[in-house]
A protein has these predicted regions:
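Long terminal segments
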Residues: 1-67, 148-247
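Repetitive, compositionally biased segments used for assembly/scaffolding
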Residues: 70-181
Length: 247
């Protein structure tokens, strides 16, 4: 089964747990740019940056293992962790949800007066998967998506909304917007003969070429499903951890 969602949601989490219990194999594709995903899930960004299976092997980076210049130190005060160059703080180290593990989620680098000028994001496999460059107002103007070798693969020029894919052979490709990028990726990942389960009705448009018999839709409630019924063969309801089929 091939599952398409806009993002990782509670409903998707519940569905995955249910399929795991049944021993039902599945793959998940989320149409956002998340880079911290499990081995069964792919996104618009990881489609380009984590093609090598080795990319999804590893464990979260322990904070003391951060690569920093010689003589720099990683200091911790309670749950606050930062990089210190011997004279001043150079970055905040934000830890992953499991605080006691002391593993890195992101590093917020300082410019002058401890204003954050860039952010490095680390995934669950222990390597830097994204870098965001920030304006003086603290907004990202360029998001850089990296592979495990730390090569810049996909660039997102945030204010323009454009994407630049950089390939090893130098055949770079420009995408005018996220919708164009999404269309190009889904053309490659949508299976020919596998059942497709949609988690967001906004995604119905991207699979309109697929036979209705191969499409299903997963909803969190039974409201406003009449139009969707005409486009898919089955509708599944995920309600408070229960999964049932709606005829």
């Amino acid at each position: 089964m091939f599952i398409i969602a806009s993002e990782q949601t509670r409903e998707l989490d519940r569905l995955q747990k249910y399929l795991d219990k049944l021993g039902q194999p599945y793959r998940v594709f989320v149409t956002n740019l998340e880079t911290d995903l499990d081995q069964q899930t792919e996104s618009l960004a990881t489609f380009f940056t984590q093609k090598d299976p080795v990319s999804k092997i590893g464990k979260p980076l322990f904070f003391n293992d951060l690569a920093v210049p010689e003589l720099w130190e990683c200091w911790t005060l309670g749950i606050t962790t930062y990089l210190f160059d011997g004279e001043e703080r150079r970055a905040n180290v934000v830890l992953r949800e499991d605080i006691l593990s002391r593993t890195v989620e992101r590093v917020e680098w300082f410019g002058q007066r401890e204003e954050i000028v860039s952010i490095d994001v680390y995934n669950r496999y222990g390597w830097r998967s994204k870098q965001s460059l920030l304006t003086e107002a603290g907004q990202s103007y360029l998001d850089i998506y990296l592979n495990r070798q730390q090569e810049e693969v996909l660039l997102h020029f945030v204010s323009q909304g454009t994407f630049l894919l950089q390939t090893p052979k130098g055949r770079d490709r420009l995408y005018a917007n996220k919708k164009e990028l999404q269309r190009a990726v889904l053309e490659q990942v949508l299976p020919e003969d596998e059942a497709v389960l949609l988690m967001d009705k906004a995604l119905l448009d991207v699979v309109k070429e697929k036979p209705k018999e191969r499409l299903a839709y997963c909803a969190s409630d039974a409201h406003d499903l009449d139009e969707i019924k005409e486009q898919v063969s089955q509708i599944l309801l995920v309600e408070d951890g229960l999964l049932r089929e709606k005829k």
